[in-house]
């Protein structure tokens, strides 16, 4: 696999940040692959939910009324034990959720996990945002090679 500078940016975030991480970029440039490779190669426990492929995960994001309900649904969908303070929760294709940004703020603020989100065309698709996650989200743009 080619080395990508963003890998080092992800590493710095993982080691030093208490915010969520959002990798934003065009479709099919390797966002999911780079995140999965980083987590796997560093032996980091993680779960992955793809909101485009998993309609139950999308429904969890769209219909949960608070972060506790959303975390309950995420844990049910994970098919593995989620360990507080250890498991990274990776939500792929976050742009599919109708208001993805608002739950991100409350998840990062109140849940004892690290969150990584990835998506495409987020600036175009995001609307009806109820609460902007200022200070709760690190955004890393990713570009094609």
Annotate each PLM feature.
Residues 1-145:
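Phosphate-binding site recognition
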